[in-house]
Amino acid sequence: MIILYSPAFTNHLKENRYFYKVKHLLENPVYNALLSGDKQLSHGNDEVKYFDEEVSPFAGFEEGNENGFSRLYESLNPGRKILYANPETIPHPGGWQVQHEIKGLQFIYQGSKLFSNDFSNVTPLMETNVDEMVQLARLTKPGPFGKRTIDFGHYHGIFDNGKLVAMTGQRLHVGDHTELSAVCTHPDHTGKGYAFKLLQHQLQIILKNEQQPFLHVREDNQRAIALYERMGFIVSRPMNFYFMKRI
């Protein structure tokens, strides 16, 4: 298969930034997470794995399984929406309506393990905060976020006058790699360093657990990419996201 990389990703390679050239668990992060660190949230069978809809729309199957989408079709009800991730572009599978495609980048953390930030205003988020978390995610659109996304764990936020204005957490747990996710700040509170502080706080948690942090971002989100690179994240590979609906 021929892959046409975007100018943004090509520039990353030209500038000699880090890029995995070998097979790696993060080439198929969803399926491998459902086999390992997120096994307790896994549904499906030996061939296909997926999360409960309220946790995440992500679904996956073993690399090279040509019947993967057919098996998912057999396992899920009509109208069920899924999100499929792959470093390569894929043909649209039969039985599925591709509603949206996003070209993204996957980043691996290679920065400092020492953080001097003051985390005193960073608060653990609980079930009682879910409604506010969903509202903030809908407003800022960091990615799919449902009533049970908090089940991935380690969500923290910053409040202003009792209102949740910024948050981040963890999502996929792939072997010894942990994904940072749901990085979002209310538009009335940008420019205050909240995202930077919350990301550093998550990095501290992940590194203390002897895990390798990683994340995904839209390739056209230059503001976020600049922040991640400033923090010590380095691009590892492209990652395409396919939002699909079972016909």
Protein language model regions, located:
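Conserved acyl-CoA
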Residues: 72-78, 197-212, 234
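Conserved catalytic-core motifs of GNAT/GCN5-like acyltransferases
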Residues: 100-109, 177, 234-247
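Conserved acetyl-CoA-binding loop-helix of GNAT-fold acetyltransferases
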Residues: 68-71, 191-204, 226, 230
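Conserved active-site alpha-helix within GNAT-family acetyltransferase domains
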Residues: 92-95, 196, 219-237
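Conserved beta-strand-loop-alpha-helix junction that forms the acyl-donor binding cleft
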Residues: 84-89, 214-225, 241-247
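A short, internal acetyl-CoA/4′-phosphopantetheine-binding micro-motif in the GNAT/acyltransferase core
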Residues: 59-60, 183-191, 218
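A conserved beta-strand-loop-helix scaffold within acyl/acetyltransferase catalytic domains
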Residues: 144-153, 159-161, 165-184
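Acyl-donor-binding surface of acyltransferase catalytic domains
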Residues: 2-3, 7, 13-44, 48-117
